[in-house]
Amino acid sequence: MKKFSIILILFSLATVSCSKMLDVQPTDSISASQAIKDKSGVENAITGSYNALHSTSIYGRYQVIVEDLAADNLIWTGTTQDYSQIANHTIAADNGIIDGIWSLNYDCINRVNNVLSRIPDIDMNTDDRNLYTGDGLFMRALCHFNLLCYFGGIPIKTQPTVDLSSINQARNTVPQVYDQIISDLLQAEQLLPATRTLGYASAFSATALLARVYLTRFQQTNDPSIAELAIEKASKVISNGGYTLSPDYAGLFNGNATESIFEIVSDVQNRTLLAQYFFPRSLLGRYEVSPPANFVQSFLLTDTTRFIASIAFDTTKLPYGFKYKDITAGTDRVYVLRLAEMYLIRAEARAYSNGNIEDIRNDVNVIRARAGLDPTTSTDYNELKLVIENERRHEFAFESQRWSDLVRTKRATTVLGISENFTLFPIPLSELQTNTLMTQNPGY
């Protein structure tokens, strides 16, 4: 993996408008201006950027698994040693999975930047220009936010990396990265349409991601004005987005899309291998990860709806993650943003800023009611914070949320028993070797 970052730069330059892998020699490489020369080229490049989110290292596998494996919803039960390091919080700088998350998020950013740099020169109508610009800004913000949550301050990339001479870039500060993410999303919110085909971002996708970003920034700064922004954006999605909670939790993973704000759509061309990594070997899976006993036992006896949709057992009573079921074709949907999160974002922002107790309970109880649980009646802020944490743990199990939840609320050190340094992942060795201005995170 040592030269993975350089390889990805070359690859993205050679395939800027492609949605498929091509075997291209360096002499065949073409510039963005050559590849993206009309509206069709822009559309293809945007599709290729969305497909990059589907890559193995982002929502196709690694990032989804790492969020629960680095926390307490999954344990390592397979043969891939890089997963063992993540589960045991002994991550080396040359860990291939962490390297992949870093490199492929930046690859998606570079693809988007190539498109955004060309859009002003392409002849197209205003609606199309706004649409594709909004797409690019949304994806750039999402990938920068992924990297920020895992690595802290990172280099902000808003221009294409056109050759290897431009890879040396120092880390921006955490506030600077937040400012860039928020700026991109506020623009995307204005440029994108209110409704969109599944798998593509809408204006409300940008609003929902803003709610998540504001909540995370609030938890780092304790600035109540930022909590209000998180509440405002979550409320906008809840009230105006036209989404409805799936009446049946299991329906979320069996075709019901009324709750989906943004998701990764899988098909035979863009498969996800998540089911293979969760399913036991008796069911032809790899069983690289599995829910530990303490997580299995953490579900309330009345929380049967979420339990049955999340965890299953083979004939030997071996537990395994069950949200991703298509082990043959790999067409499982992967949620990035859905409506339930907006209720819990609003509840968390209010709970941590001493908001109205009844409003907090109401939002939590919407989610509990769907799960078939009795409403919480707590009147204590600290109790409600733990109720929200617990709801998120079970509501979003295996949906790329748990690690970020614990780090955001500063609970990772207590819940996981790790040092503060290890709430960030190491900067990959490949990046340190190729970017002379990069510095490693403390403790690695």
What residue ranges belong to the model's regions?
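Short, surface-exposed recognition loops and adjoining beta-strand edges that mediate ligand/DNA contacts
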Residues: A32-S33, G60-G78, S165, P193-L209, ...
